Amino acid sequence: MAYTYMTLYMEQEKIVPVYDERGGEKDSVVLPQIFRFPVRKDLIRRAFLSEFTARLQPKGRDPMAGKRTSAVSLGVGRGVARVPRIKGSLRAALVNMARGGRAAHPPRVEKVLKEYINKKEKRLATISAISATSREDLVRQRGHRFSAETLPIVLDSSVLAKISTAREARSLLESVGVYEDVLRAKEGKRYNAGKGKMRGRRYKVPKSVLFVLEDPRSPLALAVKGMPGVDVVTPTLLSVLHLAPGGHPGRLTIYTTEALKLLSRRFEVTLP
């Protein structure tokens, strides 16, 4: 379904080079109309929070936690506080300030964790986040390091089958001028704080290059998946979570020519 957007300050049409498997310029391509949209940081932030909170799992506490005791208050006139105490002892129990007592305000399953957003707003936020990947100022503002002259980086779709090893992928990224961002992510890898280290979140790695490929099982996709901070996603599953980690638009992104066509088809728009 095509949407007509009445918007001001549209960007000019942008022509970017298309690179082959060696990093040389093979052709050029006109970016789809979605790359001409202005960047709405407010919408991108809301859409990110909506998608991020949708993944949260509701949690609660045992209603009887801290209450499995026969402790009762001794009353007044004994020179001690009137908190419930274990029989035969003066140890306090049950109340929230006592050791092993109930929690004062435990998390509840009924709490609404998800932040909702309108479908059209979410769609416009995704288009805006895609447009931000062509803005050099926003990409640098996110902290990405690159020496490419134009953004985004576009690869010919034939590259997917021609590169199958990490060494070849590294050579390609060096040729197009984005491998230094992978090194930035590698140097920024650090231990996570808290008990997440025991729960499968031992390290925290910065986000680096995002690959938007039509085939997530292609040799190129398998070659780059192991690189620090690199993500691979298809045009049909591309979302604000990939394009704007943390709600900050302008991720360093690499598309293929076929992926651009699929994105243009997915976000079919009509400009006035």
Curated annotation (Swiss-Prot):
Record-level Gene Ontology MF annotations: rRNA binding; structural constituent of ribosome
An example GO CC term for this entry is: ribonucleoprotein complex
Q: Which BP terms in the Gene Ontology apply to this protein? A: translation
Annotated membrane-spanning segments are none
What the entry lists under InterPro entries is as follows: Ribosomal_uL4 (IPR002136), Ribosomal_uL4_dom_sf (IPR023574), Ribosomal_uL4_euk/arc_CS (IPR013000), Ribosomal_uL4_euk/arch (IPR045240), Ribosomall_uL4-arc (IPR019970)
Segments forming a coiled coil: none
**Pfam families documented for this protein:** Ribosomal_L4
Task: Decide whether keyword RNA-binding is in the record.
Answer: yes
Q: Which UniProt keywords apply?
A: Ribonucleoprotein, Ribosomal protein, RNA-binding, rRNA-binding
The Swiss-Prot or TrEMBL record describes its family as follows: Belongs to the universal ribosomal protein uL4 family.
What NCBIfam families does the database record attribute to this sequence? rpl4p_arch
Assembly, in brief, is: Part of the 50S ribosomal subunit.
Q: Check the record and name the HAMAP family matching this protein.
A: Ribosomal_uL4_A (MF_01328_A)
- Please give the function described in this protein's UniProt entry: One of the primary rRNA binding proteins, this protein initially binds near the 5'-end of the 23S rRNA. It is important during the early stages of 50S assembly. It makes multiple contacts with different domains of the 23S rRNA in the assembled 50S subunit and ribosome.
The molecule here is called Large ribosomal subunit protein uL4
